[in-house]
């Protein structure tokens, strides 16, 4: 998605440890117009999949997730990183390691929001090692839901997550595919 790649070039910052900081439009401050375009692109890519729900993970998956769900005309469910007191004990749990924050999280979704009738589109902000996506796939599996596809805003192709998702038989669409951060510059797949 050219618009997204241009925005990453303009406002993204490569940090130590192969981290891309895009907090001016996605991971802290959110650009709703850009996220609407992200949602439209996910709709275009997955509209033939009979999606019943979008599943994402808090917090940075919510903006692209809600826009994709809005465009597809379906609800969005987000996995929580902490179980609030209002959540009952009927939940699906999965362990997720965050490479950015260097912490283990337990994510959860209340069981009443996912079922074997669901055809899920999993959406996330980044796909690097694939830990968040693996956790959401685990939750979908616990619910006996069908995963129609995985959509990510940014895939860091050199960190193995994309390969893992595809090797496990899931349809994957990434709106911006990064090949490397050579010389602290973002290089997209397919560039010379």
Curated annotation (Swiss-Prot):
First and last residue of the signal peptide: none
UniProt: xanthine binding residues: 20, 27, 156
Chief location category: cytoplasm
GO biological process, one term: purine ribonucleoside salvage
Protein role: Converts the preformed base xanthine, a product of nucleic acid breakdown, to xanthosine 5'-monophosphate (XMP), so it can be reused for RNA or DNA synthesis.
Entry's family note: Belongs to the purine/pyrimidine phosphoribosyltransferase family. Xpt subfamily.
Assembly description: Homodimer.
Entry-linked HAMAP family: XPRTase
Protein name listed in UniProt: Xanthine phosphoribosyltransferase
């Amino acid at each position: 998605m050219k618009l997204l790649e241009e925005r990453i070039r303009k406002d993204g910052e490569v940090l130590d440890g192969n981290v891309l900081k895009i907090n001016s439009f996605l991971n802290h401050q959110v650009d709703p117009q850009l996220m609407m375009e992200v949602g439209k692109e996910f709709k275009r890519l997955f509209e033939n999949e009979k999606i019943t729900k979008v599943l994402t993970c808090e917090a940075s998956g919510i903006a692209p997730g809600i826009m994709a769900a809005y465009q597809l005309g379906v609800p969005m469910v987000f996995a929580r990183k902490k179980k609030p007191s209002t959540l009952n004990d009927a939940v699906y749990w999965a362990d997720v390691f965050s490479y950015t924050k260097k912490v283990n999280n337990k994510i959860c979704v209340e069981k009443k929001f996912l079922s074997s009738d669901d055809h899920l589109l999993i959406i996330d902000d980044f796909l690097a090692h694939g830990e968040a996506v693996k956790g959401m796939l685990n939750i979908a599996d616990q619910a006996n839901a069908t995963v129609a596809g995985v959509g990510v805003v940014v895939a860091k192709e050199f960190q193995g997550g994309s390969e893992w998702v595809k090797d496990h038989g899931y349809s994957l669409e990434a709106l911006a595919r990064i090949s490397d951060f050579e010389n602290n510059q973002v290089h997209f797949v397919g560039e010379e």
